[in-house]
Amino acid sequence: MAAEWASRFWLWAALLIPVAAVYEDQVGKFDWRQQYVGKLKFASLEFSPGSKKLVVATEKNVIAALNSRTGEILWRHVDKGTAEGAVDAMLLHGQDVITVSNGGRIMRSWETNIGGLNWEITLDTGSFQALGLVGLQESVRYIAVLKKTTLALHHLSSGHLKWVEHLPESDSIHYQMVYSYGSGVVWALGVVPFSHVNIVKFNVEDGEIVQQVRVSTPWLQHLSGACGVVDEAVLVCPDPSSRSLQTLALETEWELRQIPLQSLDLEFGSGFQPRVLPTQPNPVDASRAQFFLHLSPSHYALLQYHYGILSLLKNFPQTALVSFATTGEKTVAAVMACRNEVQKTSNSEDGSMGSFSEKSSSKDSLACFNQTYTINLYLVETGRRLLDTTTTFSLEQSGTRPERLYIQVFLKKDDSVGYRALVQTEDHLLLFLQQLAGKVVLWSREESLAEVVCLEMVDLPLTGAQAELEGEFGKKAAIQDGLLGMFLKRLSSQLILLQAWTSHLWKMFYDARKPRSQIKNEINIDTLARDEFNLQKMMVMVTASGKLFGIESSSGTILWKQYLPSVKPDSSFKLMVQRTTAHFPHPPQCTLLVKDKESGMSSLYVFNPIFGKWSQVAPPVLKRPILQSLLLPVMDQDYAKVLLLIDDEYKVTAFPATRNVLRQLHELAPSIFFYLVDAEQGRLCGYRLRKDLTTELSWELTIPPEVRRIVKVKGKRSSEHVHSQGRVMGDRSVLYKSLNPNLLAVVTESTDAHHERTFIGIFLIDGVTGRIIHSSAQKKAKGPVHIVHSENWVVYQYWNTKARRNEFTVLELYEGTEQYNATAFSSLDRPQLPQVLQQSYIFPSSISAMEATITERGITSRHLLIGLPSGAILSLPKALLDPRRPEIPTEQSREENLIPYSPDVQIHAERFINYNQTVSRMRGIYTAPSGLESTCLVVAYGLDIYQTRVYPSKQFDVLKDDYDYVLISSVLFGLVFATMITKRLAQVKLLNRAWR
C-alpha cells in the first residue's frame, strides 16, 4: 500500500512539471503561423461581379476556398496525404463543388460559403476516367461518373444513384470522355489506340443504350487531352499525320470528316501533340462553336466550327497560355503572351489541361527575357480584341514562367467586360490580377512553402555602429588608428548609439498609445540587425520546387526569394551554413547541394543567406554523382568552413580549395573519417581521408537486405553543446555520460510484412572504427520509425503490432562512475564498451515528427518536441523518458528526483506549445538556440509553417512580460527616501546625545 501511495505521489509530482503556456494577450506576440494549400490542380472562379471567393483543389490533396480580395484561406479541408486522398476531378455548379477522390472511390459535394459537406457517397470500384454535369429541362440535375467499365448517373442534390450501366467492350476500349448538353442523352466516348473510336449514347432517364457507333481512327491514341466536343455534339480531333482536323457529329454522322489545316494557313508543330480546347459554359446548353487549337508549344489558333464549316477567327503565333470565361451571354477568350518580341526556348515537363484553364505544355515552350506578360480578352464570336482589357504584369524570379491561367469575367455598369485573373507559375506562385492602373497584382501566395524540404537558421548581422564597436578592440585598429583615432572613433560610435537609443525610446512611447493591432513593425532587409538576445534570425528555407526563401523569424515576413529553374522534381537537397555573420566584414555564406534523383548528378549553389544574393565565389563543377558531403570545422583565410564532397569514385573535392585549406587538410587528413550507406545492398562503410585527398576503406558492416533493410541513419548535431558530463546519483557519486560525437544510430526494419514476424532493430555504431556499441530489436514491431539522437541518449518511436499501440524506447549510454578520459575523446582509444540502459513507454498517439530542444550552452533541461497527426506540438520533458526511472522508489532515487516508472506517457493539453495553431500534415520540426540560455526557437513545417519559442526550464534569465515594474520602482524609491529620513533622524539623535 505504501508503495502504491508513493507511486501516486510521484505521478502527481510529474504532472506538476512546469509547462509552457500563453495568455490570451500573448497570442501572436512570439509566434506566427502561415497556412498554405499547395500547387493547384483544379480551380473554379465564381462568375459574378460581387464574388469574393475562388475554390481550388491542389496536388497536396487539399480542397479550399480563397478570398479573392485578400488571398486568405476562407476554409480548407485536408485529406489524406497518400494516393487515397488525391483529388481526381472537381466541378463547380452554383454554390456546390463536386469532387471525386481516392481513385474514383469517393464523391463529395461541398457548400462553397462555409465549406460544409453536403453529402458523401462511395462509388463502385473501377478506374476513374471522367466527371461531368448532366442537364435536363434547362436545369442541371445529375452528375455523370465515367469509369473504365461503367457509366453512372447520380443526383446532384443528394448524390443518390439514378442508374449505372456497363460499357460495351470495356475490356478492349478505353472510355475517356463523357458529354451531355441537356438533350436528354449522355455520350460515353472510348478509343482503341490506333484503331477506332466507340461512341455510346445513353438515355438520361433510364440509362438505356440508344445508339452505338464505331468510327475508324488509325492515327488516334488518346481522346482525353487531344480531342474535344464543340458546338452541338461535334467531336473534333487533330490528325498530325494528315495535318488536318477530323470532325464527327455525334447525333447524325457515322464517319469522320477531314478538314485540312492548309486551307487556313495553319500547321502543326513538329513532334508536338496538338490539342483541342473547347468550352461549355452551361451544362444545359451545347458547347460553344468556337475553340482553341493548340498547334505548338507557343502557337494557338481560335477556330469556329459551325454548320460543318471551319473558319479561323484569330491566330496567336506567340502565346503562353489561353483560357475561356463566360458571364451572362458573353463568352471571351483570354490570351496571355510575352510582352517583348525576343524570346528563347527552354525545356521542362509536359502539361495537361485543367478545369476552366489550360496548362502550358512546357517542352520547348517560350520564356520571356524580361519576365513581363500581358493578358488580353477577345470576343469568341468574332475574334476581335476587347478594348481596355489589357493587363500587364511581371514575374520577380528569372527562369520561371506562367503554368496555369484562370479567368473570372463580369459585366460592369456600362455593360463592358471586366475580369480578374488567377495565374500559377512554375515555382508554385499564385498571382491574382485585376484591371487597375495603380495595383495590378491584388495579392500573391507562395504555395511552394507547402513543401519545405530543408531549413537552417542564420544569425542576423550586427548594425553598422555595433560592427564599429566590435572593430575597436582589434589589433589592426590599434596599430592603424592610434590612441587619438581610437578615441574619436569611440566617441562617434557612442553618439550613433545614443541617437539610435533615443529614436527607439521615441518609437516605444509613440506606439504605447496605440492598440497593438495598429502597431506596424515593418521589417526591411536593409535595416535588418541582430536584436539584444539574438531571438530574431533569418530562416533559410528550401522547397521541393527548387525555390529558396529568406524569412524573418519573428514575423514570418519573406525578405528575399530565389528560384532554381534547372532543378527537377523529386530532387534531394542539403543546405549547409559555411560562414555565419560573426566574421564581419566577410558576408555570411550558405551552400545548397542539389542531387537529381534520376541521373544522380549534383550541383552546388552558393549564396548570401541574409540578402539572398548569389555569391561571387564560384563553386566547383561536379562531374560525378556525389555520395556524401561533410562540413568540416576547418576554415580558410576568409573564415568559411571547408566542404568535402565524395563522389562515386571515392574521390574527394574540397570547397573552397585554397592553398591554406589544402595545407590544413594535408595535416588533418589522418583524423578525418566519414561513412557511406547503401540501403539497397545493406552496406555501411567507413572511410578515412589520405593526405593526397584520396580515401581508404577502414571498416565495413553488412546487414542482410533479404532479412532487414536500413531505414534511417542518425548522427548527432554538430552544433549541440553538453554542459554536464555526468549525473549526480543519490549516494553523491557521479555517473559519467558516454559522449561519443562519432556515434551513429542505425535503424533497421524487417522485410517480412507479416505482423507476427516483423521487428525493428537498432545498432549504435562508432563511425570511426565501425565498432558496434549496442544492438537491440523490438519483435512484433514496425515503422514508420521516428528517432532523436542527442548527448548520450537515443529515443525512437515505433508501432507495436502485437499490442497495437505506439511505443517509445529510450537508450542511455554511460561510462560508469569513473571517466576514462576527461580532456579529449578518441574512438580509437576506448577499451571498454559503455553501459547501456534501456526502457520502453506507451504513447497514446502516432506521431508525425520529433525533435529535441537545443540551447546555446546546453544548461537548460531537454524537452522532446513531438508533432501529432492532429497538428499539435507536444513538449515532453526528457525526464519522463528516463531509463533509470525505478519501479519501486528508493531513498537514493528520491534524492535524485527520479520519477517512479509508469509505462504510460500521457498527453496533456497544457503541454501543447501551439495551443490552437495546428500544423497540418507536419513533416518536420527544426530547433535552434537563441542568445538566451532559457529559450529555444522552434519551427514546425508541413502544409503549414509555425514558429514559436519554448522555455524548457522556464525563463530564468530574463524578466517576465507581466513583471510589475511600478511596484518594484515604488518600493526602491520608498526605501531610498526612508534611508535618507532615517539618516537625518540618526544625525539629530547623535547631536542631541552629544549635547547632554
Curated annotation (Swiss-Prot):
One of its GO terms (biological process) is protein folding in endoplasmic reticulum. Gene3D superfamilies: YVTN repeat-like/Quinoprotein amine dehydrogenase. SUPFAM superfamilies: Quinoprotein alcohol dehydrogenase-like (SSF50998). Glycans are attached at residue 916. Keywords: Disulfide bond, Endoplasmic reticulum, Glycoprotein, Membrane, Signal, Transmembrane, Transmembrane helix. Pfam families: Beta-prop_EMC1_N (PF25293), EMC1_C (PF07774). It is a single-pass type I membrane protein. It is found in: Endoplasmic reticulum membrane. Residues 1-22 form the signal peptide. It comes from the Eukaryota. Component of the ER membrane protein complex (EMC). Part of the endoplasmic reticulum membrane protein complex (EMC) that enables the energy-independent insertion into endoplasmic reticulum membranes of newly synthesized membrane proteins. Preferentially accommodates proteins with transmembrane domains that are weakly hydrophobic or contain destabilizing features such as charged and aromatic residues. Involved in the cotranslational insertion of multi-pass membrane proteins in which stop-transfer membrane-anchor sequences become ER membrane spanning helices. Belongs to the EMC1 family. This is ER membrane protein complex subunit 1.
